Each structure stands twice: as C-alpha cells, then as structure tokens.
Amino acid sequence: MVMMKSFIVKGKFKAGNSWEKFTKKIESQNEKNATDKTYSIFGSKHGVKRSQIQIESVAEE
C-alpha cells in the first residue's frame, strides 16, 4: 500500500481578464503528482489550460 501525503499547492490561474490566487490541499504520493493533480482539477472544474495556471509553491503539510 502506498502512503499518501498531504501537499499545499499555491498559485494563480487565469479567470477571464484577471488572475485569481488559489490554495489547494492535495493528497498525493509525491510533489510532482500533486502538481499534475492540481492542473487536472483546475482543467476539469474551470476549463483552464495548463498554460493558464501558474503554480508558485508546493509544500508537504
């Protein structure tokens, strides 16, 4: 069984003409997967492409 860690991902995404800041708590195996999961969530929920998301930090909680 793989241990899942909690990561806090901070950044901003393009919402119309402005950038909106976000902070997300992501359960993931490692930092790279947490980053990919964040891109996936924003693409799914907000219809935002990866190029319109800027991740500023990923920290293990």
Swiss-Prot record:
Any GO MF annotation of the entry: structural constituent of ribosome
Keyword annotations: Ribonucleoprotein, Ribosomal protein, RNA-binding, rRNA-binding
UniProt xrefs under SUPFAM superfamilies: RplX-like
InterPro entries: Ribosomal_eL20, Ribosomal_eL20_dom
GO biological process, one term: translation
Keyword S-adenosyl-L-methionine on entry: no
GO CC annotation, single: ribosome
Pfam families: Ribosomal_L18A
Keyword rRNA-binding: yes
Quaternary structure and interacting proteins, as annotated: Part of the 50S ribosomal subunit. Binds 23S rRNA.
Similarity annotation: Belongs to the eukaryotic ribosomal protein eL20 family.
Protein's name according to its UniProt entry: Large ribosomal subunit protein eL20
Species in which this protein is naturally found: Methanosarcina mazei (strain ATCC BAA-159 / DSM 3647 / Goe1 / Go1 / JCM 11833 / OCM 88)
